[in-house]
Regions:
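Short coil/turn segments at secondary-structure boundaries
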Residues: 79-84, 182, 235-242
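Charged, alpha-helical interface segments at or near domain boundaries
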Residues: 39-134
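N-terminal ordered "arm"
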Residues: 2-57
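Acidic, Ser/Thr-rich peripheral helices and adjacent loops at domain boundaries
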Residues: 53-57, 194-208
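A generic structural motif
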Residues: 34-47, 177-185, 200-202
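Short, hydrophobic/amphipathic alpha-helical patches that form generic packing surfaces
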Residues: 18-29, 98-102, 166-170, 220-228
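Internal, well-folded beta-alpha domain core
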Residues: 109-200
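Long, compositionally biased intrinsically disordered terminal regions
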Residues: 176, 187-188, 192, 207-262
């Protein structure tokens, strides 16, 4: 009878909570891991031999999965899963699901089994997200607006805004600041002395260049002039520059605004 079972594709929301809820449903359904796949929405291509089920986000269920990962595997496993879940990848749901099947059965020792594709895949996704997050700790640029709020526009391959918000809450705890993911229409807002808040705001479109404080505008111009004046023409190496500072980050870095030859 097993060979006649239809494949179940669990379509999850493209978020950490969404994927964790998919994992919860897969483990509690008892349908069989061999007959289930996790896919990240909003759209999944099925076939004549598969049934697609939409997984609703449930914070309580997601929390149970997090607790199980930490207690039955390790905190490191949760770190890897969390990072991987924010990757720009259509395969991340299935990779996380297959990894957790192995890890719940074998414990934390599976984390070092790099010869297993599911383990290697999880590490690769997590490493890619972590690397971009580390880059943006240095590449993200805040600018002072006329209302004394520090504003930063974010462009990233992976969904790393939350990790940046946590970092800058520690670094700038007594500042009012906003991190705006301009491509995903997401905003992280921090009031001085408080925890950051997250909102999804598709209408958050106003160009902050029109609201820069006078001192910020002057500093931006001085900074551009400085970076241009210290550059040595004979030592320009655009290829190396793009390796050290990928071009996708240039758009919202003041020192790169309208610089000639870039």
């Amino acid at each position: 009878m097993e060979q006649n079972k239809r494949m179940h594709i669990l379509m999850c929301q493209n978020s950490t909570e969404g994927i964790l809820c998919g994992v919860y449903e897969a483990f509690t359904s008892r349908y069989g891991h061999a007959w289930q796949k996790l896919a990240v929405g909003p759209y999944v291509n099925g076939d004549l031999f598969s049934d697609i089920y939409s997984v609703e986000v449930n914070t309580e269920k997601a929390g149970k999965v997090v607790k199980a990962i930490i207690s039955k595997i390790s905190e490191e496993a949760w770190y890897l899963v969390h990072m991987a879940s924010e990757a720009d990848s259509q395969e991340k749901g299935e990779i996380i699901y297959r990894f957790l099947i192995l890890a719940f059965a074998n414990g934390r020792k599976v984390l070092n089994a790099m010869s297993i594709p599911e383990v290697m895949g999880l590490h690769q996704l997590s490493r890619s997200v972590s690397r971009e997050t580390q880059h943006l700790y240095g590449f993200l640029r805040f600018q002072e607006l006329q209302n004394d709020i520090l504003y930063a526009r974010l462009v990233s391959k992976h969904h790393v805004g939350m990790f940046l918000a946590e970092h800058f809450q520690d670094r700038l705890p007594m500042e009012n600041w906003v991190i705006h993911d301009v491509e995903r229409d997401e905003v992280w807002i921090h009031r001085a002395g408080e925890d950051w808040l997250y909102i999804r705001h598709p209408d958050f479109r106003q160009d902050p260049q029109m609201m820069l404080s006078s001192s910020e505008y002057a500093f931006t111009e001085w900074w551009k002039t400085f970076t241009e004046s210290v550059a040595i023409l004979e030592r320009r190496n655009p290829k190396l520059q793009m390796q050290m500072l990928p071009k996708r980050y240039w758009k919202y870095m003041p020192e790169m605004f309208t610089n000639p030859g870039r």
